[in-house]
């Protein structure tokens, strides 16, 4: 895995470059592209159901503001699942054109029609799709510190992964490293990924302390020497979020285990797959 031209392709929130993120359609497109795994984000509804959503609020990727005008600031944790399931989590893509793919002619009217009315998946639905597809997933648990779900979001996530028999095919990551300690305690079989915004003084020591398998840093401030040191110590390095082919080639040469990308087709092309 640490050879110069081999690395895992991770569809970041699904194939979100061309499909609304964190939807089952984004997952389907990522799978069809030939990726090794996909990454999703876990939050929770007010009534205790784990759902797949990146932001703390529903404003950017749903029509919650129009549908529930009095519920500002539209925090996902303040809505019951039944309410979340009424939201359109696909139409926003056409208005925002987040990666300029509509303007570039890469996403056309027919594709945009299929985005209308997409729903926020539950984690159960996402894991079910992954399991049935014989695929792998990186479950990122969003930091819910201060929210009602904080005491149980980790344990419920682990419980669901175990129920699907996916403890050994799922990587669980979080920027909240205490969550990773809780995952390890709840089910030691699950591999852990330590997400970091800022590089710790000693990444290898951090991984050992957490019992983590992989170091998951952002690309912007990452140095080649860090990747090499972590890999030499026997750990994996998954880098987020790498969308330009020149950057893909660069970190591939550094020995990255895998890359999170919004455009997995580009990375697959770089790899010659």
Which residues fall in each region the model found?
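Phosphate-group recognition and catalysis centered on beta-loop-alpha active-site segments
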Residues: 1-273
